[in-house]
């Protein structure tokens, strides 16, 4: 009856243990999103604990919520009360959703490929030779790196939101500004 709560707890405990005990698995699991799953599970457990949502009774629906492929690696972290009902409700194909989804995906690709990926080599070089940089170069590094981070994560999020939107699923925006 409460299997999803136990599953979420196990995911959160495994993620926390791996984070604290750094193992060889770090090279495999964390890049595959274990930290994301840990936060997702903690979010779910918190909502259930504070009774902001009821515990999901169907463990298959819960696993679909936890493993929803559009937010698999990059988020956004969704509240169970927002995403679970959408995943349970069959949705017909709607052309306008597909177009809107493709626009989000295109925007995400622009952010990721044309902004983040172009800035990244520059900031990498600067960070590897930080002691040899002039004041202007340090200032440029401080200005460019947040732009790179924003474009990278925001781009991935836009791609995930767009892909989900094409299926009629509305994910929460991570970056409103």
Predicted feature residues:
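Membrane-embedded transmembrane alpha-helical bundles that form the catalytic cores
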Residues: 1-177
